[in-house]
C-alpha cells in the first residue's frame, strides 16, 4: 500500500507518497527534504518526529519509551507509515 505522508518542517509543509515498506526518513530524503538523523538504526533521538495524525509501525526502534510513543513521538529512521499520516519533523527538543 502507498500512503500520503505530510511533513511539517521548519521550511514549510510537504506531502509525499510513501509505500508501507519504506522508512519515513528515507522517503523524505529521496523527495529532497532536509531531515535530521544520526544513527539511522532507531537507537538515538536525532530523527525524532511528532505524529499529529495517523499511525506508524516503528517496532524496530529501541530508544523511545511507551509514554513517548503514546504522546506521538516517532523515530523516522525506523518508522513505516501505517496509513496516511501527518508528522512534525525536527522534534527531538520536545522529547
UniProtKB/Swiss-Prot annotation:
Listed InterPro entries: 2Fe-2S_ferredoxin-like_sf, 2Fe-2S_ferredoxin-type, 2Fe2S_fd_BS, Beta-grasp_dom_sf, Fd_pln
Family annotation (Pfam families): Fer2
UniProt keyword list: 2Fe-2S, Chloroplast, Electron transport, Iron, Iron-sulfur, Metal-binding, Plastid, Transport
A single GO BP: electron transport chain
Cofactor note: Binds 1 [2Fe-2S] cluster.
GO molecular-function term, one example from the UniProt record: electron transfer activity
GO cellular component term, pick one: chloroplast stroma
Subcellular location: Plastid, Chloroplast
Recorded coiled-coil stretches: none
Family as reported in the entry's similarity comment: Belongs to the 2Fe2S plant-type ferredoxin family.
Descriptive protein name: Ferredoxin
